[in-house]
Regions:
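Conserved G1/Walker A P-loop phosphate-binding module
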Residues: 1-76, 80, 84-87, 91
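Short, charged N-terminal beta->alpha structural module
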Residues: 21-24, 152-153, 184, 190-208, ...
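Conserved C-terminal guanine-recognition region of P-loop GTPase G domains, centered on the G4
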Residues: 50-58, 63, 73-143, 170-174, ...
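G-domain G4 guanine-recognition motif of GTPases
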Residues: 65, 95-100, 117-148, 185-193, ...
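An anion/phosphate-binding loop that grips the pyrophosphate of nucleotide cofactors and donors
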Residues: 89, 234, 339
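Canonical P-loop GTPase G-domain recognition
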Residues: 114-174, 181-183, 212-221, 257-260, ...
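Redox- and metal-dependent alpha/beta enzyme cores, enriched for Fe-S-associated oxidoreductases
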Residues: 266-319, 325-331, 336
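C-terminal functional extensions of proteins
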Residues: 309, 334-336, 340-402
């Protein structure tokens, strides 16, 4: 489980005022010096991430944040980063200094409630204060208490963590019965990592194998030959979005087909909203602004999918003079209302809550959002075909195009 991608781990955000003992608590539960601790207020400046296995919960990633109530020059910037963490947190761990529960703690609790996030209270320095009984009492500097604290944390998490967070939904296991034949088309292009497959392909392969399916992986130029060599037609074909038009042209009409991006739109976000958002492409007009959001911060190549290919395809398909902005990493603009469309990447490195948060932010200001692969399928004129395995989403897409 140590190799579980961060995007599939339960995200636990440690929040609290400065010097409440968040970093000391992190060091205690992980059994390592994962974060620097000091008596000086504001020691933690950026978000510190630490992965851990918490059986029977499973793989988690702790997010240690800068404390609230920092009056230094950089305090506001640290606060902004801390609040951004809430967009990707599955659970908030509120660390209090003893029984102190003032405006800072109330603000964290209010923000967690507004986002419908479970909140667990941890009262640190319990040896110095008379702490309430509605949380976990700890002395974060007492290393001998680690086992007892872990037991309490796991018990608290089991009570509040949604079942779908612990039991990650399937990528494609519900689309075909076990022992089906699945063909995956995986181009090896300039953006492919050397000597390995990209994460979405690896996860889809593992998911198919978990459901006892037979998987054939080919490059796009070998797909037609693979179909001829198979004794029976495949039950499902999944391809990289960049070759979706070729795949659709070569796939018999009776065979289900889709893309890795569509599978991830369903796993990580809201496929219904993403399909609805794709219908907005045909309604773009001259001068409209489009935001293209990349979740990771890879080095863009000359033919980059987000910075070059999709912008070019959008302009070619619509025939419009579009203004296109790009953002990458954790950054997501606050002024989304100026955009006519947001195109989000597949989010393979993000957890589901963060992608849902972005969808929700767009929905609040009435801006349609889709993802790279769904956008590409629409631009290639084959989205209806690759949405066909998903009846409800296909119906919403067709309705939105009217």
């Amino acid at each position: 489980m140590q190799n579980t991608p961060k995007s599939l781990r339960l995200h636990l955000a440690l929040l609290g005022r400065v010097n409440a003992g968040k970093s000391s608590f992190l060091n205690l539960v992980t059994g390592q010096e994962a974060a620097i601790t000091s008596e000086v207020a504001g020691t933690t400046t950026d978000v510190v991430e630490k992965t851990q296995e918490l059986l029977p919960i499973g793989p988690v990633v702790w997010l240690d944040t800068a404390g609230l109530g920092d009056d230094t020059v950089l305090g506001d910037k640290r606060l902004a980063k801390t609040q951004k963490v809430l967009d990707r947190a599955d659970v908030v761990i509120l660390v209090c200094e003893g029984n102190k529960f003032g405006s800072e703690e109330q603000e964290i609790a209010a923000q967690a409630e507004a986002r419908n996030l479970p909140l667990i209270k941890v009262y640190n320095k319990a040896d110095l204060y008379d702490c309430p009984d509605d949380g976990i009492k700890v002395v974060a500097t007492d290393k001998s208490s680690r086992d007892a604290v872990l037991t309490q944390i796991k018990a608290a998490l089991i009570k509040v963590v949604p079942d779908e967070v612990i039991n990650t939904p399937t990528l494609l296991g519900d689309l075909v019965p076990s022992h089906s034949v699945i063909v995956m088309i995986t181009p090896i292009d300039k953006e492919a990592p050397k000597g390995r497959m990209i994460l979405p392909q690896v996860q889809a392969l593992r998911d198919a194998l978990d459901f006892d399916n037979i998987v054939v992986m080919v490059k796009e130029n070998e797909y037609a030959a693979a179909l001829q060599k198979l004794k029976v037609l495949p039950d499902l074909v999944v391809c990289d979005s960049q070759v979706v038009d070729q795949m659709v042209a070569q796939t018999p009409p009776a065979v289900k087909c889709t893309t890795f991006s569509i599978l991830f739109a369903r796993l990580k976000g809201d496929l219904l909203k993403m399909a609805e958002g794709a219908a907005a492409i045909s309604k773009l007009k001259d001068g409209d602004k489009v935001l293209i959001a990349e979740a990771c911060t890879h080095h863009a190549i000359e033919d980059d999918i987000g910075k070059v290919k999709i912008p070019n395809w959008l302009r070619q398909k619509t025939g419009c003079r579009l203004q296109i902005d790009n953002v990458s990493g954790c950054g997501f603009p606050n002024n989304l209302s100026k955009y006519a469309l947001v195109v989000q990447c597949g989010g393979c490195v993000k957890n589901r809550r963060e992608i849902l948060s972005r969808i929700n932010q767009c929905e609040q200001v009435g801006v349609p959002i889709t993802n790279y692969g769904i956008c590409i399928s629409e631009l290639k004129g084959v989205l209806q075909r690759v949405l066909s395995p998903f009846e409800q989403e296909l119906a919403e897409y067709l309705r939105s195009r009217q």
